[in-house]
């Protein structure tokens, strides 16, 4: 597997000294989040034949089928497998610039029958359906997203047949769009302590506060975890409550160039899953400086995180798992007592963990 690193980020850091910039840093410090239980887990590597992965990023298991997303797939971005034996059935989401192809992928949602995938460059949602023979995915439609969604990177199905997308323009936390991609409303705000800077640099804050999101419709719990810094937000949309949790890394730190925001603090979270019982978050906790120095020395740090944190649906710390692999994506199956994870640093990326 080819290992892909953020070389463009390193180049941008290299030219920071050429510009006058504004540095956005947290106003106050927060204590480290502590967990009452910590457990070390040893994973079992599961071979995936027939597919060459460049950057296996996300996976979802639904019934007897699995979809794995390759963020930088050379030919296709998505791969359908059987479960639990992981026999490859079909590759779909062809890479390219044609009308039936995808230029990029970021997030997807799969319920076992219907899959929605997000193409950031084309600003559209694409829908596939599992065939009657259950051995391939059939492309059915594409939906152009409202221009107000701006840089859509993550998406979850939400209430009343709508979709929820983090708003990277910075003037709200989310954009809610209907089944046709039209904006229904914007809501929420970035929970920064630097309100004045947010008003001055909304686009920079929108990017700097990029978050991974997930929603559990049964409980009405919506969670966002920042990629940079260490902030997690929990909404209970049924009870209309909102809680903000800030850890030791605090709010995202970044420097503002003429038209960009460059993260300078630390990478906090990598993925999130909300089940009906708990919140699971991959935590990386590595500073951008350490990441860059290791890369410059030719010894890049593993991508992903080796810690999975478990919170209650109310945000109380429950447990922290220490993994023997650095992983980018997880899929927790509480009923089976296991967690599937993707190690992008390995030629055999699929790892099974037994949860204790």
Predicted regions and their residues:
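Beta-strand-rich domains and repeat architectures in extracellular enzymes and scaffolds
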Residues: 45-76, 279-291
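Structural signature of eukaryotic scaffold interfaces centered on beta-propeller domains
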Residues: 57-60, 106-110, 154-159, 203-218, ...
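Asp-box/WD-like beta-propeller blade repeats and closely related beta-sheet repeat scaffolds
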Residues: 123, 130-161, 165-166
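Beta-propeller blade signature
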Residues: 176-178, 296-314
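Conserved blade-ending motifs and adjacent loop-strand segments that build the rim/top face
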Residues: 249-258, 313-333
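A short helix->beta-strand "capping" segment at the edge of beta-propeller domains
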Residues: 28-53, 316
């Amino acid at each position: 597997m080819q290992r892909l690193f953020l070389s463009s980020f390193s180049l941008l850091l290299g030219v920071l000294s050429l510009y006058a910039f504004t540095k956005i840093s947290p106003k106050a410090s927060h204590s480290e989040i502590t967990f009452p239980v910590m457990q070390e887990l040893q994973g079992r590597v599961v071979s995936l034949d027939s597919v060459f992965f460049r950057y296996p990023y996300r996976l979802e298991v639904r019934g007897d089928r699995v979809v794995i997303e390759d963020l930088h797939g050379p030919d296709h971005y998505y791969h359908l497998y059987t479960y639990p034996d992981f026999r490859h059935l079909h590759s779909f989401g062809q890479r390219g610039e044609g009308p039936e192809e995808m230029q990029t992928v970021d997030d997807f949602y799969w319920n076992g029958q219907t899959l929605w995938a997000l193409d950031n460059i084309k600003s559209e949602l694409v829908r596939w359906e599992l065939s009657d023979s259950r051995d391939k995915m059939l492309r059915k439609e594409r939906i152009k997203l409202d221009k107000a969604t701006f840089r859509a990177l993550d998406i979850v199905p939400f209430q009343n047949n709508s979709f929820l997308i983090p708003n990277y323009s910075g003037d709200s936390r989310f954009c809610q769009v209907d089944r046709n991609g039209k904006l229904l409303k914007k809501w929420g705000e970035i929970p920064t302590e630097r309100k004045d800077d947010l008003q001055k640099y909304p686009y920079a804050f929108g990017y700097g506060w990029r978050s991974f999101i997930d929603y559990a419709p049964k409980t009405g719990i919506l969670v966002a975890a920042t990629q940079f810094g260490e902030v997690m937000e929990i909404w209970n949309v049924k009870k209309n409550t909102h809680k903000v949790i800030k850890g030791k890394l605090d709010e995202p730190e970044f420097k503002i160039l003429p038209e960009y925001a460059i993260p300078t603090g630390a990478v906090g979270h990598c993925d999130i899953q909300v089940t009906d019982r708990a919140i699971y978050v991959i935590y990386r906790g590595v500073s951008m400086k350490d990441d860059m120095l290791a890369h410059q020395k030719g010894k890049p740090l593993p991508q992903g995180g080796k810690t999975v944190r478990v919170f209650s649906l109310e945000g109380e710390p429950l447990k922290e798992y220490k993994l023997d692999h650095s992983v980018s994506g997880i899929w927790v199956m509480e009923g089976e007592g296991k967690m599937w994870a993707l190690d992008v640093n390995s030629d055999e990326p699929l790892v099974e963990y037994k949860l204790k």
